[in-house]
Amino acid sequence: MRVLIKNGIVVNADGQAKQDLLIESGIVRQLGTDISPQLPCEEIDASGCYVFPGGVDVHTHFNIDVGIARSCDDFFTGTRAAACGGTTTIIDHMGFGPNGCRLRHQLEVYRGYAAHKAVIDYSFHGVIQHINHAILDEIPMMVEEGLSSFKLYLTYQYKLNDDEVLQALRRLHESGALTTVHPENDAAIASKRAEFIAAGLTAPRYHALSRPLECEAEAIARMINLAQIAGNAPLYIVHLSNGLGLDYLRLARANHQPVWVETCPQYLLLDERSYDTEDGMKFILSPPLRNVREQDKLWCGISDGAIDVVATDHCTFSMAQRLQISKGDFSRCPNGLPGVENRMQLLFSSGVMTGRISLERFVELTSAMPARLFGLWPQKGILAPGSDGDVVIIDPRQSQQIQHRHLHDNADYSPWEGFTCQGAIVRTLSRGETIFCDGTFTGKAGRGRFLRRKPFVPPVL
């Protein structure tokens, strides 16, 4: 199969040029002006459009069981939505397994979830829900098998204490793995939540009030210090929602610590006023939405390079699930928002088209840096000879209003309903195969491949 994309502006993290792009057998073979292939091929005219590397979303939760509910997107509907939004690779955060289970247990479960369903290429982050000698011994074997990042939680049922965190950080560092962490102070949250529940204050706005930004920022600072104690272990903070936590990360970098951070579109574009609407339960997620001042601080980090990655934390529970389970009580509502289909378009519209970020920075945030950090570079995250032919074509001239009835996930609502975006995703190619074109999904379940990722190496830019 040969595909020639002509007349577009090809953009990588290190530059852009108007040139053609030739893909053969799923691999980029040539970039240049006026490419004339000697053999027949499909031609795609990208005149007036940008040709980007396919998006790499390193934070999704498909088919996750959170105890009170299972998310309504599985690895078909979730990756279908990703494909229609210009994302061609996902790394899914595996959910907790049975109490006392080995790391391999969840990997086998999740590979079963994704096989025969995933539309795009995929990998997983391991999850460390308890620490013992068997778990620590298992980590290097998992890295050898292509799982080079693992997640720790400082909140929820399987939160780790400081001693367990230190043990995990040391072994992951020694094994060539990157530690990712959900940082919130669980004890402080539990105290605040109990106060509100005792007072009968269970409306959605009290979800945000029970998880103030200081709970997140304190946990970020603690993880930074523990990583330093653990031998300057590399650390990746997921779903940052506030500026104070970003300040701590800036300080750590000034002290030459290997720390990286992601944020998500919801923290850049939605705010805590959503909790006071009639549909406030739609916006329950953790960390919660913050105020506009915190948004502005995050946008500064996006613009000046302090934030490395924009992912989604896509974790979809339908409004029907939320209402049935919660009965209007925030503390009983399953947490998470949909968004894997909207990430690329939202950041392009609100970042590039407003002048906040360059085209190159857009690529860095959405594909290049995620691929570098998580062992996929240069197979993913770049359009260059030898890389996978993963492409998203965006037409900046088109304006679109987001409406859930046009989306491809399995939810019954979108938090982005009514958002108007400048710039439209017109085509997505995965390894040279068109899987989305002009509003129509054309991929097939099961075509996605499991990606064995390389051990962690700090990116050199």
UniProtKB/Swiss-Prot annotation:
Q: Which UniProt keywords apply?
A: Hydrolase, Metal-binding
Annotated substrate binding sites:
156, 286, 335
Q: Which GO terms describe its biological process?
A: pyrimidine nucleobase catabolic process
Q: State the coiled-coil residue ranges.
A: none
Locate the residues binding a divalent metal cation 2: 151, 182, 239
Residues bearing N6-carboxylysine are: 151
Q: Which GO terms describe its cellular component?
A: cytosol
EC number(s) given by UniProt: 3.5.2.-
Identify the residues that bind a divalent metal cation 1: 59, 61, 151, 313
Q: Which cofactor does it need?
A: a divalent metal cation
Cofactor comment text? Binds 2 divalent metal cations per subunit.
**Superkingdom, according to UniProt?**
Bacteria
InterPro entries, per database record: Amidohydro-rel (IPR006680), D_phenylhydantoinase (IPR023766), Hydantoinase/dihydroPyrase (IPR011778), Metal-dep_hydrolase_composite (IPR011059), Metal_Hydrolase (IPR032466), Metallo-dep_Hydrolases_sf (IPR050378)
What does this chain do? Answer: Catalyzes the stereospecific hydrolysis of the cyclic amide bond of D-hydantoin derivatives with an aromatic side chains at the 5'-position. Has no activity on dihydropyrimidines. The physiological function is unknown.
The entry assigns this protein to a family as follows: Belongs to the metallo-dependent hydrolases superfamily. Hydantoinase/dihydropyrimidinase family.
* Subunit and partners: Homotetramer.
The name on file for this protein is D-phenylhydantoinase
